[in-house]
C-alpha cells in the first residue's frame, strides 16, 4: 500500500482524515507566515533569515514534491505549491542581502549566487536520489526530516554566530514551530490510524529526530530572548553615554 495515496487509506484513517487535513492546513499556514515574514525581515534588516544550507535544502525538497512527485492530496499540493512560490522570494532576498553578512570572507561574498545555485542543485539531486533509493513516498518524509533538522540547527547556530537578532523575530520562530508541530500532529495520525504504511514513524531514528527538533527549536526561543536582552542592554548603555 502506497502511503502517499490517501485514496488507499484504511477506513480508520479516512474517519480522521478531516482532522489530519486541518493539521496540513495549519502546517501550510505556519510556513506561509514564516516565509512572508522572512521576506519582510530580510528587507527590513538587509540580511537573510534562514541559514544558506537549510534554505537550499528546503527549496529543493519543495521543488521535488511540488513538481516532480506531487502529492495526490489536493490540500497538500496546494500547500506545497504556495510554499514553493513564496520561498522563491525568500531565496531572492537571501541572495540579494547575503553579501553583507560575508564581508569577512571575500571569496564567499563574491560567489554567493553560485553557492546558492550549487547547494540547491546538490540537495535537489540528493532528494531525487533518496526517492530512487527508497521510493518517493518514504523519501518525502525522510527528506522533510533532514530539512527540519538542518533548519532547526542552522537557525540556532546562525543566531549564536551573529550574536544579533537581525533577520530573526519571535514571529518567525513561532510560525516555524507551528508549521513543524502541525506536521508532527498529522504524521502522528497517520501512524496511529494507518499503520500499514506509517508504522515506521515509530522508529528510533524518527523519535530521535523529533526529540532533537523539540530541543533545538525550544532552545532557539530562549537564546533569542537572551540575545535580544543583550542588544537592548547595549542600546541603553549607548544612550547613557550620549547623555
UniProtKB/Swiss-Prot annotation:
Localization terms from the record: Membrane
For this protein, the parts annotated as crossing the membrane are: 19-39, 48-68, 78-98, 112-132, 137-157, 172-194, 205-225
Protein name (Swiss-Prot/TrEMBL): Terpene cyclase penB
Q: What is the lineage of its organism?
A: Eukaryota, Fungi, Dikarya, Ascomycota, Pezizomycotina
Which Gene Ontology molecular function entries are recorded, alphabetically? lyase activity
Give the matching Pfam families: Pyr4-TMTC (PF25129)
Membership in a protein family:
Belongs to the paxB family.
Q: EC annotation?
A: 4.2.3.-
Explain the purpose of this protein.
Terpene cyclase; part of the gene cluster that mediates the biosynthesis of the indole diterpenes penitrems. The geranylgeranyl diphosphate (GGPP) synthase penG catalyzes the first step in penitrem biosynthesis via conversion of farnesyl pyrophosphate and isopentyl pyrophosphate into geranylgeranyl pyrophosphate (GGPP). Condensation of indole-3-glycerol phosphate with GGPP by the prenyl transferase penC then forms 3-geranylgeranylindole (3-GGI).
Q: Does the keyword Transmembrane apply?
A: yes
The encoding gene is penB
Glycan-carrying positions: 111
Task: Output a single Gene Ontology CC term carried by this record.
Answer: membrane
Membrane topology label: Multi-pass membrane protein
* InterPro entries, A to Z: PaxB-like (IPR039020)
**Keywords from the named record:** Glycoprotein, Lyase, Membrane, Transmembrane, Transmembrane helix
- Chief subcellular site? membrane
Q: What class of enzyme is it?
A: lyase
This protein's pathway reads: Secondary metabolite biosynthesis
